[in-house]
From Swiss-Prot:
Family listed: Belongs to the universal ribosomal protein uS13 family.
InterPro entries per the UniProt record, alphabetical: Rbsml_uS13_C, Ribosomal_uS13, Ribosomal_uS13-like_H2TH, Ribosomal_uS13_bac-type, Ribosomal_uS13_CS
A Pfam family recorded for this sequence: Ribosomal_S13
Keywords: Ribonucleoprotein, Ribosomal protein, RNA-binding, rRNA-binding, tRNA-binding
Subunit structure: Part of the 30S ribosomal subunit. Forms a loose heterodimer with protein S19. Forms two bridges to the 50S subunit in the 70S ribosome.
Protein name: Small ribosomal subunit protein uS13
Highest classification ranks of the organism: Bacteria, Pseudomonadati, Pseudomonadota, Betaproteobacteria, Burkholderiales
Alphabetized GO MF terms: rRNA binding; structural constituent of ribosome; tRNA binding
GO biological processes: translation
Chain positions covered by the region annotation Disordered: 94-121
Superkingdom per UniProt: Bacteria
Gene name per UniProt: rpsM
Length: 121
């Protein structure tokens, strides 16, 4: 297995698909990395030479990926919550941020329904 940006890239996959195992790299960016480094994106990871892997590591190093990207996203959300803006408040309450309805739906964001307790007479 090839190791790029601290992630093991599966050997059996094409280079373009294998690079998407790295957090922060999707199909488009993976393809652009392959083109910039001169590596064929249809080549299997197991067929890459050490020189190819080094070129890929160099290109991936130009982007914010993995732990740094996760930290950056978390800090951005924390900043919104500290500001107390609308989006920050919605993050804090665990509700949708972008104007979706919440009277019904929004179950993914709100979590499972809480059962209503029956009133005693």
């Amino acid at each position: 297995m090839a190791r790029i940006a601290g992630v093991n890239i599966p050997n059996h996959q094409h280079t373009e698909i294998g690079l998407t195992a790295i957090f922060g790299i999707g199909r488009t960016r993976a393809r652009s990395i392959c083109v910039a480094s001169g590596v064929a994106f249809s080549k299997k990871v197991k067929d890459l030479t050490d020189a190819d892997l080094e070129k890929l590591r160099e290109e991936v190093g130009k982007f914010v990926v993995e732990g740094d990207l996760r930290r950056e996203v978390t800090m951005n959300i924390k900043r919104l919550m500290d500001l107390g803006c609308y989006r920050g408040v919605r993050h804090r309450k665990g509700l949708p941020l972008r104007g979706q309805r919440t009277r019904t739906n929004a179950r993914t964001r709100k979590g499972p329904r809480r059962a209503a307790q029956a009133l005693k007479k």
